[in-house]
Amino acid sequence: MAWALKLPLADEVIESGLVQDFDASLSGIGQELGAGAYSMSDVLALPIFKQEESSLPSENENKILPFQYVLCTATSPAVKLHEETLTYLNQGQSYEIRMLDNRKIGELPELNGKLVKSIFRVVFHDRRLQYTEHQQLEGWRWNRPGDRILDIDIPMSVGIIDPRANPTQLNTIEFLWDPAKRTSVFIQVHCISTEFTMRKHGGEKGVPFRVQIDTFKENENGEYTEHLHSASSQIKVFKPKGADRKQKTDREKMEKRTPQEKEKYQPSYETTILTECSPWPEITYVSNSPSPGFNSSHNSFPIGEGNGSPNHQPEPPAPIVDVSAGLTPIQNLMPTSTPQEAQQWLHRNRFAAFSRLFTNFSGADLLKLTREDVIQICGPADGIRLFNALKGRIVRPRLTIYVCQESQQLREQQQHKHENGEPGNGAFYVYHAIYLEEMTTIELTEKIAQLFSISPHQINQIYKQGPTGIHVLISDEMIQNFQDESCFILDTMKAETNDSYHIILK
């Protein structure tokens, strides 16, 4: 009896569910071109981020976003309706992204007159690759030593301040900008989509990437950690000119389709609008904890708004003195240097980009590398520079002379011996080497001033003692005709008119 009562109830539930499903399946018919057919939440629910729930709350779908980012290149015409746009890029080519302020009057007043920070990333679109992102990027680093995945084209950019590129995060760049001013950043993507395909037999499809922008405002402590807005877009990167060919091929294919088939596809838009997304989950860690070698000092490179050229010369970056806490800076790499000291030496000698490649290398390991080894690891330019630095090679000066300062006491001793008829060849002279590159009187004056610990302005003239004791004024041409490793005794003579001195080379 119990079974007889439950069966009709179950049938009614199943039948009711089928009716609801059928009604839901018909609800979209005739609305394909309507406003309700395209749901932003559907796009944001794509498996494009590492977090499972990446779609935004439904109540925020219709709000006006504070910022908008526009990638100034056309979208692909071969994308179906309700699918996310896809944009093709050429490897290494500079593409403009416009940073637009969409705030209403009175909205976010705390940003007025303030800067915000934006962090750009190129990440994987496919979830399968997201799970192995670290291994994928490490493999790319080994195959392309010294290269970056993402770069800023600073000369072409406008309005960006303090651009930075962390040498340990090849796919990330960041900068500050003023929302009230025109801001455009030109980015370059150096990896291509086919570099991350599983099977490489030729003709395979490349994996899609995402370019994501996260923007933050300053908190009470002056750190840019308060999230304001995030947006991203799907891209594919081809070898140079490959994106143009792919765009042309897609356009020709669409032209061959019937009008009914074309209605199923989106038109190609002249620009790509980045759509809102969830912030990158590790952004606060990256922002607050730069890795060794990431220059966290505020050496800004403001970009002018007119022609994109810097409005003043940037200050030279401060030398890195303490890379590893508790270590004293070392000048030369020794065979006994520990891996930590080797890392410090790499940073001090401007090889921070390769520090991760040589993480476990001791001083002996680095010094054993051949010229071919370092060129293969670091590329020709940086490889030769690293090899010369490891071997301690110093550029040979164009001219070397040896000088000795003749003291008053030594002069009196020589004069006394001469008056008494004693031989004067027992004097002991200590010489100093002077290395000249430009071989000019100005350079010689500066080097002699350093030797005497005086200002170059205190040296009036430099003479060379000639035949019969005459004083010949030193000129650039005379210095250029000095014999290499010539020896001179320096004598000083007070100038007649001021507190300066004449130097005589004997």
From Swiss-Prot:
Organism field: Xenopus laevis
Compositional bias per record (Polar residues), positions renumbered to this chain: 291-300
Biased composition (Basic and acidic residues): 241-265
Gene Ontology cellular component terms for the protein in this record: nucleus
Keywords: DNA-binding, Nucleus, Transcription, Transcription regulation
GO biological process, one term: positive regulation of transcription by RNA polymerase II
InterPro entries assigned: CP2 (IPR007604), SAM/pointed_sf (IPR013761), SAM_3 (IPR041418), TF_CP2-like (IPR040167), TFCP2_SAM (IPR037599)
Pfam families assigned: CP2, GRHL1_C, SAM_3
Region called Disordered, residue ranges: 238-268, 291-316
Annotated stretches, region: DNA-binding: 133-395
Protein's name according to its UniProt entry: Transcription factor CP2
Domain Grh/CP2 DB intervals: 61-300
Similarity comment: family membership: Belongs to the grh/CP2 family. CP2 subfamily.
Gene3D superfamilies according to UniProt: Transcription Factor, Ets-1 (1.10.150.50)
Leader peptide range in chain numbering: none
Top-level division of the source organism's lineage: Eukaryota
Protein task: May function as a transcription factor.
GO molecular function: DNA-binding transcription activator activity, RNA polymerase II-specific; RNA polymerase II cis-regulatory region sequence-specific DNA binding
Subunit structure: Component of the SSP (stage selector protein) complex, which appears to be a heteromer of TFCP2 and 2 copies of NFE4.
CDD domains (alphabetical): SAM_TFCP2 (cd09589)
Designated gene of the protein: tfcp2
Cellular compartments annotated: Nucleus
